[in-house]
């Protein structure tokens, strides 16, 4: 049986024959027409319309969510690129700081530009004045240092160079053929024993010639020039003897008792070219003799900001100072 809601136009009515002739029953078969099999019903309920609208809204929301997800993926990629660039910049900055480090003293003492330039100029003048010795050009005079900047305190030479320039006397043809067995280097500075020449004449002490023989002047002049050339090592055996900051003999015996100025003087006179730039740094940190002996290459490089070559030289001089070999001629 076909439902009442179905229309007779949409179906095909077919009579089914019966094999029983006595039976008056008539059977019909109903089949849907092919053109109406896939045809949607014309009448749509309100509930189905609402469902389609909801599905459309959900699809729109899903599409927007997909767009947002794609945008977030792009942002993540860009953030990764930015992080790599920032890390690269940080590594480059750290490398530049390590290679171009300033001295440790400049971190605590930041002067104004004008004041800093003025101090540097004054210190440069002090360095030039400390190494200017107007009387030290003679090989026979001891090296003397200034105690103050005033020119009145400069030491005056006790004798002139003209005393050591021998006059060339006329050579006697008779004495020139007789060799002298005595050499002036056999006598010390305070040896006053008389010596003899080949002609038997006796001369006085080595402090001055005797009269009576023209050969005596030439022997005395030769001895004075040889002795004068050999005398400066004994006179200038220590460059610190005439300094006002250090007592005589204390610079080589007790380096642990040095003051800051004594350490500065040690730097200036040991290696002026390499160690003079460290004078201001040592003064600012107040490095005395005890601190000087405790310095190592790691402390100089990491904490004081000294260059590698200067640190190696200073450690070498400190080791020689500990062994007592720094002031050997």
From Swiss-Prot:
A cellular component term, taken from the record's GO annotations: nucleus
Which residues does the UniProt record annotate as the domain SAM? 258-325
Alphabetical list of SMART domains matching this protein? SAM (SM00454)
The UniProt annotation puts the region (Disordered) at 136-160
Q: Which InterPro entries match?
A: SAM, SAM/pointed_sf, SAM_Scm-like
Annotated localization:
Nucleus
The record's listing under Gene3D superfamilies reads: Transcription Factor, Ets-1
SUPFAM superfamilies registered for this protein in UniProt: SAM/Pointed domain
Keywords associated with the record:
Nucleus, Phosphoprotein, Repressor, Transcription, Transcription regulation
Query: Can the keyword Nucleus be found in this entry's annotation?
Result: yes
Residue runs in coiled coils: none
Q: Residues where Phosphoserine occurs?
A: 138, 238
Recorded hits in PROSITE patterns, A to Z, give: SAM_DOMAIN
- Known function: Putative Polycomb group (PcG) protein. PcG proteins act by forming multiprotein complexes, which are required to maintain the transcriptionally repressive state of homeotic genes throughout development. May be involved in spermatogenesis during sexual maturation.
Into which family does the record put it? Answer: Belongs to the SCM family.
This chain belongs to the protein called Sex comb on midleg-like protein 1
Q: Which organism is it from?
A: Pongo pygmaeus (Bornean orangutan)
